[in-house]
């Protein structure tokens, strides 16, 4: 995107080398995927950074046609840091983001986003099942970090 005397990279053009931490890199990949956007590699990632672009569980969201939405359209409030959406198979994806400079707890009551009952939770970044969730999801999120959970009906 350009204009007179200005150039701005499109939001889905990701240069991982410009981020200060792995937590920021995970957030930079996760947010466009949660919003249903593509991921475009626009730098020369090293072997470590390349792994962020090769997370098959996260890339499966895009292949499914997933498009999530923020819990509330409050750009600066904490509720804008919670994203969710449903996959074609009926499972859900919930993303908890932290824009703060320090670690913070992010929580969402599942019924408030239309999710009812008990679900198996899987952390898509670390490829681990996290047990059963119902009622509320709450997690300590590192500064500029995120947690992306896939919820599958029990």
Where on the chain are the PLM-derived regions?
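Active-site-proximal substrate-binding groove within the catalytic cores of carbohydrate-active enzymes
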Residues: 1-126, 139-152
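Short, solvent-exposed S/T- and G/P-enriched segments that are highly enriched in secreted/extracellular
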Residues: 132-137
């Amino acid at each position: 995107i350009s204009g007179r005397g200005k150039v701005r990279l499109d939001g889905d053009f990701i240069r991982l080398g410009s981020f200060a931490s792995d937590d920021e890199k995970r957030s930079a990949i996760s947010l466009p995927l949660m919003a249903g956007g593509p991921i475009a590699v626009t730098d020369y990632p090293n072997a470590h950074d390349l792994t962020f672009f090769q997370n098959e569980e996260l890339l499966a969201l895009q292949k499914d046609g997933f498009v999530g939405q923020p819990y509330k359209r409050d750009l600066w409030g904490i509720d804008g840091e919670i994203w969710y959406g449903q996959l074609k198979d009926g499972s859900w994806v919930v993303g908890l983001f932290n824009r703060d400079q320090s670690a913070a707890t992010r929580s969402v009551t599942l019924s408030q986003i239309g999710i009812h009952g008990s679900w198996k939770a899987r952390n898509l970044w670390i490829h681990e099942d996290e047990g059963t969730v119902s009622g509320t999801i709450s997690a300590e999120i590192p500064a500029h970090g995120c947690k992306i959970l896939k919820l599958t009906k029990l």
